[in-house]
């Protein structure tokens, strides 16, 4: 996989930023993991919201990347739980849906970045860094 131009590995102290990834589609998890590595340390890739909460409780990542629509707890519900417990610094939603209502729900829940899966190759890494800096990030497909 060819990396987006301008991407550079950034470290927190002496280590890469660590993340947990959640998506119910195995192929999507694999593609996103390949996109993120080696820039970030992917601690675990899980398939649902409950597993996401459990992984963040165990691993305390810097950032979580989560699909919205997953079995059981959806990405917004799981993200709300993770943020409420103070288990990570930032959450990035990765979704197929650009519905304004979903975007607003995510932002109200404290999720800092919303990236469409169609925009992920070009925008996921910048979105993660923006979220870690405390900034809000909406991918191009959401801003339209």
Give the residues covered by each predicted segment.
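Conserved acidic segment of CheY-like receiver
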Residues: 15-27, 32-33
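Acidic catalytic/metal-coordinating carboxylates
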Residues: 48-51, 71-78
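Short, flexible helix-to-coil linker/hinge segments that flank and couple to helix-turn-helix
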Residues: 101-108, 112-144
């Amino acid at each position: 996989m060819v990396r987006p131009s301008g991407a550079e590995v950034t470290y927190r102290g002496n280590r890469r930023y660590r993340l947990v990834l959640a998506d119910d589609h195995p192929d999507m998890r694999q593609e996103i993991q390949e996109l993120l590595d080696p820039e970030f340390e992917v601690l675990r890739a899980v398939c649902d919201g409950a597993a996401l909460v459990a992984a963040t409780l165990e691993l305390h990542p810097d950032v979580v990347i989560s699909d919205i629509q997953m079995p059981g707890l959806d990405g917004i519900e799981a993200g709300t739980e993770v943020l409420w417990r103070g288990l990570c610094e930032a959450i990035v939603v990765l979704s197929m849906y650009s519905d304004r209502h979903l975007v607003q729900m995510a932002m109200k829940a404290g999720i800092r970045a919303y990236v469409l899966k169609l925009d992920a190759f070009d925008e996921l890494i910048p979105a993660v860094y923006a979220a870690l800096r405390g900034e809000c990030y909406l991918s191009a497909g959401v801003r339209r």
